[in-house]
């Protein structure tokens, strides 16, 4: 078959004479094999391109996580330093070349005390911790205030001329062991104070008149559990509602806001999100009738039906809510165990193993969040005193513990923190920081070089 054209395609491989194009019959088998070859080549190139994109992405993700680990290490370092500074009033931690000045001592005391009234400036009706429990918030270990107060009374009688915590732990009162509160009990009962991120695990919102966990969307349910189980709540000065299981000597009203001020506090009974009972009982905050009215008004604003809700107002009996009267008759608490997740305190309500609220452990382990500001959920860094002093002494010439003032190069650039700064921290902090960003799930010696520097 010939097709005649008015154009001249002399240079065309299909031309057949001047001005003519000859289209010969096509061999379909040859075309098919040629197409298969092209398709295979396309598949190979696509696969190679995908692998390259994955490598670039994984490399970027690893670099970002390594950079994040430096941020985590810096925050862990300052948490360890903060604890050491708070603990300095109890045990001489730093090897100062000269005695601590009065100004330095007052700065440390004001730092501790400032945590007690946090939030008072936001709302006029906010309530701070009862005076008896200030000592709990100031104590770096947050030992149960009721127990500490017994030793505080003995310290007042002794007139030893020593600061209370120094007298209690290393001074004249170190051998004092009260029958009503033995040393073992004082050491064991330490109140857990939540950080900003930990606090989110206990936050609840009101949706269509029912109390719902903010993160999981599950209804609050306190009806199941062993007899005597108590669920407590606080409402912050920002009108955020927090609730969880009370654990004597471990988790109390002061735990939610780390000793900060509240608008309301008490105890609740909730059946699948439906409020049944409100009790304005809190030994830590000792709420008034006004605070209870404020909380009831908050519930009404959020369409909670209070017609069938049993309300117990604050009274003198609230002082015994935290088991002050019957603390001597109760059984000794179980030894403290390390908690794997911040949500665990809310799920250990049932001796039969029936948790009332779903755990977020698996979700937390499988998700990686790069938001590190505002605290790390208080992951306490176990840094030996020797390692801390070694780093402090190495930085004395710069007279600063700020990382940006220690290194020859800047702490961060326009694209973020410098990965090389990780080598400036103790090994324990580096390992914990890598675990936090899911780069090192378990401690492995292979992650560290023989010199103790990070192999990255």
Curated annotation (Swiss-Prot):
Region (Disordered) residue ranges read 315-358
PROSITE patterns associated with the record = IQ (PS50096)
Localization annotation:
Cytoplasm; Nucleus
Free-text tissue specificity from the UniProt record: Expressed in roots, rosette and cauline leaves, flowers and siliques, and at lower levels in stems.
This protein's major location comes to cytoplasm
Keywords attached to this entry: Cytoplasm, Nucleus
Identify the InterPro entries for this entry: IQM (IPR044159)
Cite a GO CC annotation: nucleus
Top-level taxon of origin: Eukaryota
- Give all residue intervals belonging to the IQ domain: 46-75
- Tell whether Transmembrane is among the UniProt keywords: no
Does the entry feature the keyword Cytoplasm, yes or no?
A: yes
Q: What induces it?
A: By cadmium and lead. Down-regulated by salt stress.
What biological function has been recorded for the protein in this entry?
May be involved in biotic and abiotic stress responses.
Name of the protein described by the UniProt record: IQ domain-containing protein IQM3
């Amino acid at each position: 078959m010939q097709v005649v054209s008015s154009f001249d395609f002399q240079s065309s491989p299909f031309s057949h004479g001047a001005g003519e194009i000859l289209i010969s019959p096509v061999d379909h088998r040859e075309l098919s094999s040629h197409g298969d070859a092209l398709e295979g080549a396309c598949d190979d190139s696509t696969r190679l391109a995908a692998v390259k994109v994955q490598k670039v992405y994984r490399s970027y993700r690893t670099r970002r996580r390594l950079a994040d680990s430096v941020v985590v290490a810096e925050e862990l370092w300052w948490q360890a330093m903060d604890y050491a500074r708070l603990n300095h009033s109890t045990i001489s931690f730093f090897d100062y070349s000269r005695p601590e000045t009065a100004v330095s001592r007052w700065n440390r005391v004001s730092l501790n005390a400032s945590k007690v009234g946090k939030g008072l400036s936001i709302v006029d009706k906010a309530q701070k911790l009862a005076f008896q429990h200030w000592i709990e918030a100031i104590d770096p270990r947050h030992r149960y205030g009721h127990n500490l107060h017994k030793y505080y009374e003995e310290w007042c009688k002794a007139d030893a001329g020593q600061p209370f915590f120094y007298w209690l732990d290393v001074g004249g009162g170190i051998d004092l062991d009260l029958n009503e509160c033995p040393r073992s009990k004082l050491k064991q009962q330490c109140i857990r104070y939540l950080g900003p991120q930990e606090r989110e695990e206990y936050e609840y919102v009101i949706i269509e008149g029912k109390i719902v966990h903010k993160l999981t969307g599950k209804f609050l349910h306190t009806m199941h559990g062993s007899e005597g189980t108590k669920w407590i709540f606080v409402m912050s000065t920002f009108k955020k509602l927090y609730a969880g299981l009370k654990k004597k000597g471990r988790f109390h009203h002061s735990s939610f806001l780390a000793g900060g001020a509240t608008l309301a506090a008490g105890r609740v009974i909730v059946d699948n999100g439906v409020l049944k009972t409100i009790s304005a009982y809190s030994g830590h905050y000792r709420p008034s009738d006004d605070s209870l009215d404020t909380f009831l008004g908050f519930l009404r604003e959020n369409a909670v039906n209070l017609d069938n809700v049993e309300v117990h107002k604050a009274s003198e009996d609230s002082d015994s809510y935290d088991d002050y009267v019957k603390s001597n008759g109760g059984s000794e608490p179980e030894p403290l165990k390390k908690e794997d997740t911040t949500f665990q305190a809310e799920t250990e309500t049932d001796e039969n193993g029936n948790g009332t609220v779903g755990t977020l452990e698996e979700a937390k382990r499988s998700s990686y969040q790069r938001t590190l500001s505002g605290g790390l959920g208080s992951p306490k860094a176990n840094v030996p005193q020797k390692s801390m002093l070694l780093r402090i002494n190495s930085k004395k010439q710069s007279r600063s513990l700020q990382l940006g003032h220690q290194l020859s190069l800047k702490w961060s650039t326009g694209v973020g923190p410098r990965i090389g700064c990780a080598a400036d921290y103790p090994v324990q902090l580096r390992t914990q920081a890598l675990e936090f960003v899911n780069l090192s799930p378990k401690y492995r010696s292979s992650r560290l070089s023989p010199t103790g520097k990070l192999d990255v």
